A protein has these predicted regions:
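Catalytic alpha-helical scaffold of carbohydrate-active enzymes acting on polysaccharides/glycoconjugates
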Residues: 1-137, 142-190, 216-238, 246-288
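Surface-exposed cleft-lining segments at the edges of enzyme active sites
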Residues: 48, 135, 201-214, 241-243
């Protein structure tokens, strides 16, 4: 089993801030299972539902983040970078971070280590050639990875992951010899918009979901989640998708959430990479 270093109970954040907020969005577009199994080629409506994310929803989301002076991390499959390069350039132009999320949203848990490395190499080349950046962060597509993935990512130059769910503070994945592999910034499914807002008739995804939650209740739930992390001094990140949450009617949910974050004092708004750098630096201070 992969090993992890248990984090301190009471994290310390820069400049005396009470908690950390690392907003994160997955710009999946039409990538994912239907692209991987080939069915997307024969389902143009489903393709258009995914394409709506980078084409229409992403610019709207970037404008809202700018309105509230918030920065975020965007995990982007590089197939999306290839097909909507200009939209991805606007992410960087807005002062946000871009990070790895597979090429076509592959299921890393089902990929051999060699295949995982191939995907990372393809992704890096596309990020460098299209956007002139080399990401340092990773969120596993489809939510899980194999036992070898953490070490593979660290050897590839990745410094953090936001893939696991088992804590509300950053922690370190450990190598077999006990040394640090990379920082984990865990995100909880409580703040995954698919849980409350995603509904596709065909294919049936998420399976069995036959309703959309009341937007007012979704906003209240997400604000409560943030408030709990603020109260306890933790690190709050999100699993949100422009194609799901950044539609005209739903943008009010995000606006209510952003207002609530801004109403609270001593909140460190950070890229995930900044959280990882801080966590690593604090660990070195403790060791020293």
């Amino acid at each position: 089993m992969p090993r992890a270093l248990i984090p301190p109970s009471n994290p310390i954040w820069p400049d005396g801030n009470r908690c950390a907020v690392a907003l994160a969005f997955d710009v999946d577009g039409p990538t994912g299972d239907a692209m991987l199994d080939g069915s997307l080629l024969h389902n143009f409506r489903y393709f258009s539902e995914g394409a709506y994310g980078p084409w229409r929803a992403l610019p709207r989301l970037l404008d809202l983040l700018a309105d509230y002076g918030l920065k975020a991390t965007f995990f982007v499959p590089t197939w999306v970078v290839q097909h909507w390069t200009d939209r991805c350039e606007k992410i960087l132009g807005g002062g946000h971070e871009i990070a790895y999320h597979g090429h076509r949203h592959e299921v890393f848990m089902d990929c051999s280590p060699q295949r995982q490395l191939e995907i990372m190499m393809v992704s890096r080349e596309i990020f460098q050639s299209r956007l002139g950046v080399t990401p340092v962060g990773f969120r596993t597509p489809s939510g899980d990875w194999s036992e070898e993935t953490a070490n593979l990512l660290a050897d590839f130059g990745v410094i953090y992951s936001s893939s696991m769910r088992g804590d509300d503070r950053p922690y370190f994945h450990l190598r077999g010899d006990g040394s640090r592999a990379l920082v984990e910034i865990p995100a909880r499914p409580d703040i995954d918009d698919y849980t409350a807002l995603a509904y596709f008739e065909d294919p049936d995804f998420p399976a069995g979901l036959d309703r959309i939650s009341d937007y007012r209740l979704v906003e209240q739930n997400w604000c409560r989640e943030f408030q709990g992390y603020y109260r306890d001094g933790l690190c709050w990140t999100t699993i949100l998708h422009p194609k799901v949450v950044a539609k005209p009617g739903r943008l009010g949910i995000l606006e209510g959430l952003f207002k609530d974050i801004r109403r609270h004092e001593n909140v460190w708004i950070a890229h995930c990479a900044e959280v990882a750098d801080w966590w690593t630096a604090q660990d070195k201070i403790v060791e020293g």
